[in-house]
Every structure is written in C-alpha cells, then in structure tokens.
Amino acid sequence: MLLGCDISSISRIEKIYKKYGKAFLDKFLNSHEQALIKSPATLAGFFAAKEAVSKALGVGICKECSFFDIEIYKDSKNAPKLRLSARIMENFRIKTSALSISHDGNFAIAVAVLEK
C-alpha cells in the first residue's frame, strides 16, 4: 500500500488563479476536472489531491507522473475518485486507489491511498 498526503492554502491557490485565470487551470486540470471546480476551496483540494498521488508514488510531479496522469472525478454521491493513466497503472503496478479531500479554514488537505 502506498500513501500520500498534501495540504494547500486555499488563499494561495485563489491568488494564483486570480492572476493567471484559465492558464493556471490548464497547467494541471483537464476540461472535465475544470468543469467540477465551483470554488477556490475545490480548486485547492484538487491541487492537493494530485500532489498527494504523486507523493504516494514516491516521485512527485515529474516526467514519470504528470498532473495529467492523474484525473479526479466525482462519483454518484459527489465523493472524489481517482482515475490514473494506463502508464501510471502499469509502471507503478497500481491495482486500486482511494482519495479523500477535506477543507478547514484556509486549507485543503488530500490523502491518496494506492494499492499494488
């Protein structure tokens, strides 16, 4: 089992978004993920989630694992879920994944669990 955790400042992510707009979103979210963003808290949570997955893999965001190898979607109960690229699933031998995102005050935290 692989575990990764990340925390992001909602105000910091909001400040970057206000400065760069959609160009910032395009750096780490696909169009489906962008459609799910309803608030700065959600945006910070998605950023933290992708960082948490990359940490669980032990590589961070890099050539081996880009932001776009990790997709976040919502299930029928609006809970966040992960969809990893075939490249990640194969290279890291990942069988299942779980994701939790939470917000409190000015922070978003994400925990990713990957099972080999």
Q: Each predicted region: which residue ranges?
A:
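Core catalytic alpha/beta fold that binds nucleotide/phospho-ligands
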Residues: M1-K116
